[in-house]
Amino acid sequence: MKSLKRLIKSNKKKGDKKNVSFMDWDEPPSYSDSRYGCYPSAPLFGVDEMMETLPTLGIQSLKIQYKCSLQVRAETPFTSFNDAARCISLWETDYRGYAGKKPFYRLLMLIATKKLRAAPMSLMDGNRPEYSSMIQGQSIVHHSLGVIPPMMHVPETFTREWNLLTNKGMITAQIWLGITDVVDDLNPLINPALFSDEKEMTLTSQMFGLELKKRNDNTWLISKSY
């Protein structure tokens, strides 16, 4: 009887070894099988480990250098600045530019739209109206948009056709935008004096996807870009 028990015990141990060998080689454990202490170790590309621990940045001040050249052709003349803003705000349809620059591009396009001037010859009978403007310089922009990625001063060109019930045409914009490290005091880019009044500035900025807010010191900031 003792011999029989030893034989059964010996066969059982051999069977266990066969099972282990089979699991190790023919059917390896899953990638996250905790029995083997094996867990995924591949990096999560595109996820910044610091993003969850960043404190609220609050209001920031960004010194930028910029240039924006804007050309617009229309089927009929614009009747007002609001009319022009409504049409030109369509410049970012199917936007494929730098995502981090988009809020500041919107601000530059708003200002460039305010400064549009018509070519006199284009307003003659039979011609399609042509408008153009160009702004450039160095300014400071206050914002509460969170982390802004590095921005190199390189050009991007946007060409878009627009078509509304009342008018249609073509928009061509070339924009240079980058962060500057100048130590000089710079004038704010958001300046209500460029507009008829503060209401005009805030309402047309909404057409361009921006929310501007006035601070206690009477300076303005980009509070939201949507």
Curated annotation (Swiss-Prot):
It is found in: Virion; Host endomembrane system; Host nucleus membrane; Host nucleus. Its main location: virion. InterPro entries: Vesiculo_matrix, VSV_matrix_sf. One of its GO terms (cellular component) is membrane. Forms a double layer around the helical nucleocapsid, the inner matrix layer binding to the N helix and the outer matrix layer binding to the envelope glycoprotein. Plays a major role in assembly and budding of virion, by recruiting cellular partners of the ESCRT complexes that play a key role in releasing the budding particle from the host membrane. Condensates the ribonucleocapsid core during virus assembly. Late-budding domains (L domains) are short sequence motifs essential for viral particle budding. They recruit proteins of the host ESCRT machinery (Endosomal Sorting Complex Required for Transport) or ESCRT-associated proteins. M contains two overlapping L domains: a PPXY motif which interacts with the WW domain 3 of NEDD4 and a PTAP/PSAP motif, which interacts with the UEV domain of TSG101. This is Matrix protein. It comes from Isfahan virus (ISFV). The gene is M.
